Amino acid sequence: MASPASANMNAVRETMDVLLEISRLLNTGLDMESLSICVRLCEQGINPEALSSVIKELRRASDSLKASENSTSQG
């Protein structure tokens, strides 16, 4: 028989697998590590909508920086 800690760990793993599948279906682009960080932040009281906005803004900034680097290296 599985210990309570082992059963809890299996439940956490299963929950994260389901969340990752939902994340993929929604095409969020989050990997397991990023999703895990987001879940932990939400569990600690961070507003999910604010977190989503920050992630989107960071992606925009990253894309803009990459585009800038590409145009600089090509010209």
From Swiss-Prot:
Keywords associated with the record: Cytoplasm, Cytoskeleton
Matches recorded under InterPro entries: MZT1
Source species, domain of life: Eukaryota
Residues annotated as signal peptide: none
Any one of the GO CC terms: spindle
Keyword Iron among UniProt keywords: no
Cystine pairs: none
GO biological process: gamma-tubulin complex localization; microtubule nucleation by interphase microtubule organizing center; mitotic spindle assembly
Compartmental location: Cytoplasm, Cytoskeleton, Microtubule organizing center, Centrosome; Cytoplasm, Cytoskeleton, Spindle
Complex formation: Part of the gamma-tubulin complex.
Family per record: Belongs to the MOZART1 family.
Function as written in the Swiss-Prot or TrEMBL entry: Required for gamma-tubulin complex recruitment to the centrosome.
Name of the molecule in the record: Mitotic-spindle organizing protein 1
Species of the source: Danio rerio
Taxon lineage: Eukaryota, Metazoa, Chordata, Craniata, Vertebrata
Gene transcribed to yield this protein: mzt1
